[in-house]
Swiss-Prot record:
Main localization of the protein described in the UniProt heading: membrane
One Gene Ontology CC term in the entry: plasma membrane
Compartment(s) of residence: Cell membrane
TM spans (from-to): 10-30, 42-62
Keyword Cell membrane: yes
Protein name stated in the entry: Uncharacterized protein AF_2158
Membrane topology: Multi-pass membrane protein
Alphabetic keyword roster: Cell membrane, Membrane, Transmembrane, Transmembrane helix
Length: 73
């Protein structure tokens, strides 16, 4: 493995970690915003919808990034 490839993989790992941290922060902030905006009566409904949308997005991305490249070999 070349040195440049190693540096590239390390940078990619750092960027991936930063992405995960920022997504967690966004998720927490969205939940707080739902609590403030929707009030206690409807906040559960909005959180369920947000969690379902997040689940669908993650499933789609896993399918696109992991499953399909294996099938194209």
């Amino acid at each position: 493995m070349e040195e440049g490839e190693t540096v590239r993989k390390i940078l990619l790992a750092i960027l991936f970690f930063a992405l995960v941290v920022s997504l967690v922060g966004l998720y927490v902030s969205a939940n707080v915003m739902i609590d403030v905006w929707a009030g206690q009566k409807y906040s559960t409904v909005y959180k369920v919808l947000m969690n379902a949308a997040m689940l669908l997005i993650v499933i789609y991305l896993i399918q696109r990034l992991i499953i399909q490249p294996r099938n194209s070999d």
